[in-house]
């Protein structure tokens, strides 16, 4: 399943990131991809050796970790170190699949269950640059407001279409979920959303408590910690 997570960054946060990224050192984006991806990848990424990068990636992690909807949808166990990319002048990233595992500075290795793109450019400021994701439900074309994030299964073929005008800047990362199976994770998310909706309408009651108990028992049964 694909999920739109709005408002991960405020407009003020987005402006801060854009200002900081204007000062960043950008390198060939192929430095962080494997042989297959390098054949179709043509973009730029912030140099991960810089102090500016270290500060900005930490700010992204803080933002997503504090966002309740992101947590409910992803049920994250491990987040990769966020990266930053930039597309301009017809740069693109052809169809590819993300690697199943990635190295992690604290955990050694992590499994990539979900991929996330956090948009940092106003969609009206550039042409093209759509994230295109192919999954079992068809093809999805994504171009979100700055500050919004999209989550999708890392097993999906996806690409970024050429940016023919302006500049598209984003942060991206991978998530190892506590729930490995996409279908089980989706069921838990739907159950959680409905519990929260019922609580907002009716307050706490025995039926809602029973559903909450069901949610946590399923999470306990299915989670890998």
Curated annotation (Swiss-Prot):
Family matches, as SUPFAM superfamilies: Clavaminate synthase-like
Residue ranges of every copy of the Fe2OG dioxygenase domain listed in the record: 78-177
EC number, UniProt record: 1.14.11.-
Keyword Metal-binding tagged: yes
Protein's GO biological process: DNA damage response; intracellular iron ion homeostasis
GO molecular function: 2-oxoglutarate-dependent dioxygenase activity; iron ion binding; L-ascorbic acid binding
Enzyme type, top EC level: oxidoreductase
Keywords: Dioxygenase, Iron, Metal-binding, Oxidoreductase, Vitamin C
Top-level division of the source organism's lineage: Bacteria
Residues noted as binding 2-oxoglutarate in the record, renumbered to the chain: 168
Cofactor(s) demanded: Fe(2+); L-ascorbate
Residues binding Fe cation, per UniProt: 96, 98, 158
Co-factor binding comment: Binds 1 Fe(2+) ion per subunit.
Protein name: PKHD-type hydroxylase YbiX
Organism: Shigella flexneri
């Amino acid at each position: 399943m694909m999920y739109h997570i709005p408002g991960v960054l405020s407009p003020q946060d987005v402006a801060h990131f854009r200002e900081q990224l204007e000062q960043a050192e950008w390198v060939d984006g192929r430095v962080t991809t494997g042989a297959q991806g390098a054949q179709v990848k043509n973009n730029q990424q912030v140099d991960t050796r810089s102090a500016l990068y270290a500060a900005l990636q930490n700010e992204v992690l803080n933002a997503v970790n504090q966002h309740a909807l992101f947590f409910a949808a992803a049920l994250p166990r491990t987040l990769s170190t966020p990266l930053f990319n930039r597309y301009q002048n017809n740069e693109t990233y052809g169809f590819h699949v993300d690697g199943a595992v990635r190295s992690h500075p604290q955990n050694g290795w992590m499994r990539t269950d979900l991929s996330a793109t956090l948009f940092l450019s106003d969609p009206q400021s550039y042409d093209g640059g759509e994230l295109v994701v192919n999954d079992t439900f068809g093809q999805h074309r994504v171009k979100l407001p700055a500050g919004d994030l999209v989550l999708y299964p890392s097993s999906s073929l996806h690409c970024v279409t050429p940016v023919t005008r302006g500049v598209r800047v984003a942060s991206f990362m991978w998530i190892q979920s506590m729930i490995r199976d996409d279908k089980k994770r989706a069921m838990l998310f739907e159950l959680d959303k409905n519990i929260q909706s019922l609580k907002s309408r009716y307050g706490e009651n025995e039926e809602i408590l029973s559903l909450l108990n069901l949610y946590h028992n399923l999470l306990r049964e299915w989670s890998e910690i």
